[in-house]
Amino acid sequence: MPRVIYFDCFSGISGDMALGALLDAGLSLDALREALRRLNVDGWDLNAMREVRGPLAGTRAHVIAPEGHVHRTLDDIRAIISTSSLPAAVIERSMRIFAILAEAEAQVHGTTVDRIHFHEVGALDAIVDIVGVAAGLDLLGVEQVFASPLPLGAGWVRSAHGPLPIPSPATLAILASVGAPITPDETPFELTTPTGAAILAALATFRRPSMRLCAIGYGFGARQMERPNALRVWLGDPDEEEDASRQRGLVLLETNIDDQPAEQIAYATDVLRAAGALDVWCTPILMKKGRPGVQLSALVTADLEDTAVSLLMCETTTLGVRRRTVERHVCDRDIVEIATPLGVARVKRKRWRGELIGAAPEYEDCARIAREHGVPLAAVYQMVMGRLENGATKC
C-alpha cells in the first residue's frame, strides 16, 4: 500500500533535517547511501547520528562534502541527476525541487532561469540533501506528502550574496509561489531554508491528512537552540475511512463581493486552498443596482472554519460570511505515478463502491512535461492514459 507522510514543521525545515527525520522514521541509511551512489558523483559521504536534545531523541544527518565555491547552473544539476540510474520518480521529484529553486532565484535577482548560478544549493552537499529526500521518500513507499504551516524565524543570515534578512528572499518567493501557509515566529535564526521550502513547495499539500500512523521520526538541525531544533515526520498508511469521515461535519462558507478586483479574489481562493479548504469556487451573481459580482464559496472541515473565516475577512472586501453545515457523498480516490518516456506524471483514479470508474492525469505534471519537451499537452495526456491502461504504474 502506498504510504502517506506529514512534515510537522514546528521548528522549520532544512534539507538535512528532512533527511534526519526520514532516517529516524525507519529509512535505512545503507539503502539511502546505495541509492545516492547512483548519482555517479564522488567526494561525498552521509552520516547519521542518534542524539538526545532536551526531551527529544532523534537523528542528525550530516552530508560530508568538500567545501568550496561551486557555481552550478540548473542545466548542470539536471545533467547530474538525469544521467544517474535513480528511479524515474526520484529523478522527477529532484528535478521539480531544483526547478522551483531556480525559478525563485531568477525572480529574486530579476533574471531568467537559464542565467541562474546556484551557490549554496549548487554545492554537492545540497544536491545530496535534495536527491536524498526524494530517494528516501521513494524507499519508504511514500506517494502522498503533506506539511504543516511553516515558521520562518527572524534576523539576518549569511549567504554567498552577503547578509540577507530572514526569511531569505528566495524562501519567501518559493512559499509565495504555492501560497504556502506560514506562522509568526520571532526566533532569531533561519528556521525554514530555501532548500526546505522548495522540498515542500514541490511535493507537499499543506494540510494534515487522515492516516493510520506507523512511525514517527525526528530530524535535528545543526544549530543548538533553547527549544528543540527538530523536524518531525509522521509516516503512515492512508485512512481507508477518510472519505467516509468527510461526508459529515463539513461547513460551507459563502460571501458576496461586488467591489474587489478579480485578481485579488483569485488570490483569496488560492490562500483558502493552501490553508486546507476541501473546495473553493466562485459563482457570477447580479447584486443590488444591477452590479455584477461573485459569490465566493469555500467548503471546509469544522476545525478549519475559524481560519477560513479569518482569511475571507482579511483577503476580501466582505463585511460578513454566511455558514451552514452540509454533507457530501465522495468517491474513493488515490494517486498513482505513471512512468512515460518523457517523465513521470501523476494520475488521480476514482472508485465508487469498490469499482474503478475513472482516471484523470494531473494537469501540472502534464503541462510541465509538454513545456520541457515541446509537445502538445493533448499528446501528453494521451500518452499518460495509454501507459495507465497498459499497466505502467509505479505503485
Swiss-Prot record:
Positions of disulphide bridges:
none
Q: Which GO terms describe its molecular function?
A: lyase activity; nickel cation binding
Record keywords, A-Z = Nickel
Per the database entry, which stretches of residues form a coiled coil?
Answer: none
Key word Acetylation present in the record? no
Q: Where is the signal peptide?
A: none
One Pfam family assigned to this protein is: Ni_insertion
Which InterPro entries does the UniProt record give? Ni_insertion (IPR002822)
Family, as annotated: Belongs to the LarC family.
Question: Any idea what this protein is called?
Answer: Putative nickel insertion protein
What are the top taxonomic ranks of the organism? Bacteria, Bacillati, Chloroflexota, Chloroflexia, Chloroflexales
